[in-house]
Amino acid sequence: MSEKAYELAHIDELDRFPVDDEGLLWRPVRRRLGITAFGTNAYTAEKGDERVVEEHHEQDGAEELYFVASGRATFTLGDEEIDAPAGTFIYAEPGTKRGAIASEPKTTVVAFGARPGVPHEISAWEEIFVAFGHLRNGNEEEGRKAMAAAIAAKPDAWQGQFNAACFEALTKNSDAAIEHLRRAIELDPRAAEYAQKDTDFDWLRDDPEFPV
């Protein structure tokens, strides 16, 4: 019997990872379907009048296409504002500032992106976003597994260790938080500068073992 030749998922079946405390949800599509040629994710604003696409530029030449799957959004493209009801496609040229605010509750925007002529590189830090998404959903152990996978993918990068320290600080696991932060600083002293400003560590600063 041949291997399965397709993957199928309804948008309602996608993971729902909170991005913040305001109701914005990250709905991984590429990860769910195993796509490697381009990036694609969905974002849902549970409330109206909140950001559903962060304001940003694509400076590396990546092309991005957005599709409003449900609800309604107001896109900012350069200096223009565009009303985009459900069913609207929006393509932004590389370098164009873009972002979107949900005009209605439950607005979902699906984003697709890749750099022309360049093999798509899956972000090594995607699992970090998954880890914090699980944590915000109250699933600490699944979050810890995702964080471990991110570190294993890039063991010599300070960012993974730093984010693991933040994760453990948020779960009030002081020993693990300090251990990861020490390792991050060993890999790159910049981690100490970031730790000085990161409020995740505020409750740990009086600990004599805290390395900053």
Name every feature range the model reports, one short phrase each:
Residues 1-56:
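A short, N-terminal "cap"/entry segment at the start of jelly-roll beta-barrel domains
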Residues 58-75:
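Short, conserved beta-strand element in jelly-roll/cupin
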Residues 79-94:
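Short acidic-glycine-tyrosine-enriched beta hairpin
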Residues 104-120:
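A short hydrophobic beta-strand segment most commonly corresponding to one strand
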Residues 124, 158-159, 192-193:
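Helix-start (N-cap) detector for alpha-helical repeat units in TPR-like alpha-solenoids
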